[in-house]
From Swiss-Prot:
Pfam families per record: Ribosomal_L22
PROSITE patterns: RIBOSOMAL_L22
Keyword Cytoplasm: yes
Signal peptide region: none
GO-annotated biological processes: cellular response to amino acid starvation; cytoplasmic translation; positive regulation of G1/S transition of mitotic cell cycle; translation at postsynapse; translation at presynapse
Location in or out of the cell: Cytoplasm
The family this protein is said to belong to: Belongs to the universal ribosomal protein uL22 family.
Classification via PANTHER family: 60S RIBOSOMAL PROTEIN L17 (PTHR11593:SF10)
Species whose genome carries this gene: Mus musculus (Mouse)
Name assigned to this protein: Large ribosomal subunit protein uL22
Amino acid sequence: MVRYSLDPENPTKSCKSRGSNLRVHFKNTRETAQAIKGMHIRKATKYLKDVTLKKQCVPFRRYNGGVGRCAQAKQWGWTQGRWPKKSAEFLLHMLKNAESNAELKGLDVDSLVIEHIQVNKAPKMRRRTYRAHGRINPYMSSPCHIEMILTEKEQIVPKPEEEVAQKKKISQKKLKKQKLMARE
């Protein structure tokens, strides 16, 4: 059994999914994961499908050097964004895996929320490229590990209103003013 970096608050109402050494760019996947964090599973699935179709963008907040601006990033309150298709597809597969794990556990799939999602760097894979004058440069790939925990969102029940309204405390100054007004 692999250790997750976070234990769910209520393990009976949670499901997990993880992938190791995935051949997808770490930086793009990290930005995509941050975008879907806290979303409902249906909303996240629709969003990731829209990213692959370039209908919605992923805001690039940390790894944004040289990332161009796009109008779709405005809805996130940001200027820079991209459409990392491969990262979105990998995260879609992981959401599908988590959904099937939830069904196996007997959880309500429609009320699942992405409580925790984390992308870590995996060991780099090394290749080489040949340059002018007989030199050789590295040609590395940056794979990643992804883990996510989905939790059933509990229905928030409002507190019942108290039948007896508590008396408001009135300062001495206001009391004197009220008595003065009553005399007149």
